[in-house]
Structures are given as structure tokens and as C-alpha cells.
Amino acid sequence: MYPPPPSSIYAPPMLVNCSGCRTPLQLPSGARSIRCALCQAVTHIADPRTAPPPQPSSAPSPPPQIHAPPGQLPHPHGRKRAVICGISYRFSRHELKGCINDAKCMRHLLINKFKFSPDSILMLTEEETDPYRIPTKQNMRMALYWLVQGCTAGDSLVFHYSGHGSRQRNYNGDEVDGYDETLCPLDFETQGMIVDDEINATIVRPLPHGVKLHSIIDACHSGTVLDLPFLCRMNRAGQYVWEDHRPRSGLWKGTAGGEAISISGCDDDQTSADTSALSKITSTGAMTFCFIQAIERSAQGTTYGSLLNSMRTTIRNTGNDGGGSGGVVTTVLSMLLTGGSAIGGLRQEPQLTACQTFDVYAKPFTL
């Protein structure tokens, strides 16, 4: 978001807490103030060379002045809140057509199905008019900080991402497959990607007891992008085992007592589909569409196992007789995901990872 300092001598960035929402902010070199992308508060930094010495006083110091316009963001202690990020990378060779639609559909689902307040949902897309809600690396980082800021028992948090994902060689030995999974912000070519280790440290490990986090990640190589300790390996018959993905180093990748569950678009070595076949009507990511469809069709109290099975079956049957007996919705889905072709299905399998193992056919799914 900020240009690098002109000096060739590297100086570590200074971190300050926002005077409004207390989110950690990275202060550009030489700056004396910074505006928070989340609550819009302006935090001023005194120049130590010119600031007068503090006067002794027995009176308590006044609270910092907050310059945030009211009603911009929810208070971070809401019972439910979500960060939804959809990136189309438009006008670039990486362009995706369906990701902003994914974000809008997920927002609609959270509000209408799971009773999230519209004010508790932070949207990051290229269509946002506020430049601080464009899905740059810095804005995404601050949004993730906001998501878990001050969370308490009873809170339900959601992180949805639709965009490019990648992976890179891991050298510290904490990955079973030898690769770190990554998310690609809008400016990833200049600012770099967000690595799974950082995502885990930001929104997983701080979760206290009683807080529930769900991530829905529609991206390539996203199977273990939250770096959670356990992966549910399920076959076509619906039988499953939990694979232990805890690092051999012993580094803890779980929570501080809370619950973290991730549903992702594909395995770490697979890619996720995005299509513009019906762009005059709609375009979306395969995983997000199947996730929402499975939720809408499910009965009250559906389990994680039945949800995952439904998503996998829909994707697997895409292109094979229009998805079976699903009717108009499935036929449209088939055209959408195969570009109008009736030949072959998609080669991606949604994955489930968690901080703890559980019976996926007994635990009800809810956000």
C-alpha cells in the first residue's frame, strides 16, 4: 500500500496500535500519522526530537482522540462478524471472473441464512469505493487482525476468500508435503503473497475458549491454507480418517482453546475452477457455488460430513449427465463449471481441516 523508503539501508517497520480499534498498523518510514483501513481513525505519532517533555500531573491522561466517522465498522466484540474477500485481478493476465460474485453471494448467505448483521461484515473487493477496502496485502492483513480483535466466548467468526492461491517451498520443516500454501492479494506481484504460517498466527492461534472460526477458501492449493493440525481425508463412499498434519518440529498450529474449521476448494496439489461461460448471467467459483447450494438444500441440523459429501458429489458429477437429479439448479451449475461442455467432470475435491478431530457425521454445521 505504501511505496518503499528511498534509503537503501533497511529499517524494520514500526508497529503502532490504532487509536480507535487497537489494530496493529505498520507505520511507513518517516510518517508521523497513519489512517486505519478498518475504522478510519487517524493515529498521530509524536516526533521524539521535537516533542516537549511531559509535565508531571496527578490527573489521569485523557483518552486518545478518535477521528473515525460513526457507523463505519462494527464494534469488534459483536457476536457474529465476518471478513469476505473476493479478488478478480481485473485488467491483468491473472484475471478471474467469478470471485466478486462469490463474495456477494457469501454475504447474502451469511445475512439471510445465518443472521449476520450487515454491519458486522467487512467486504474487501475491487468494487469497494473506499481505497482501504481494496484487497491489497496490507488491507487483508488488517482485516484479519480486526476479525479476531477482542473476540470472546460465544463469538462466531467467518473468513471467506475467493481468488488466486499458490504454494511455495517450505524450508523450516513444518509442512507435511514440503510446501507452504499461500493466498494472493491484489498486489501480490509487488508486495508478495500471504503465507499459511501468517494466516494461522493471525486468526487461529489467538482464538480463546468458546470462540468459533470458520474459513471458506475458494482458491487453488487451498487444502491446508490455515495450517490446521488435522485434515479429514474422505473417500468417494464417504468414509474418512483424520490425517495428522502437526509439524514434526512440535510447533503448535492449533488455537488457544477456541474452535477453528476450514472448508477449502481443493487439496494442496489441486486447482479450483473459475469460469466465465455464463458471464452474461453469472460467473462464480466452483467451490463457493457448491457450498452455498449444499447449505440451501440441506435440512436443519446438517452435519459437516453431509455438507462435504454434497459438495464433492456435485463437483464430481458436473459434466456427467448434468449432475443427476438435481433439476434446473444443477443443470445450470453443470454449464457454469464446465464452460457449457458435457464432457468430463472437475478435478478438484473440497477439503475439511480442523484444530481438533471430531465425528463429521454427528457434529451439526452452523456459522
UniProtKB/Swiss-Prot annotation:
Comp. bias regions, Pro residues: 50-73
Q: What is its EC number?
A: 3.4.22.-
Please describe what happens when the gene is knocked out: No visible phenotype under normal growth conditions, but suppression of hypersensitive cell death response upon infection with avirulent pathogen.
Please provide, alphabetically and separated by semicolons, the GO molecular function terms listed in this UniProt record. Answer: cysteine-type endopeptidase activity
Relate the assembly described in the record.
Interacts (via N-terminus) with LSD1.
Q: Which family does it belong to?
A: Belongs to the peptidase C14B family.
**Summary of the function given for this chain in its UniProt record:** Cysteine protease that cleaves specifically after arginine or lysine residues. Does not cleave caspase-specific substrates. Acts as a positive regulator of cell death. Required for both oxidative stress cell death response and hypersensitive cell death response mediated by immune response.
Fetch the NCBIfam families from UniProt: LSD1
The molecule here is called: Metacaspase-1
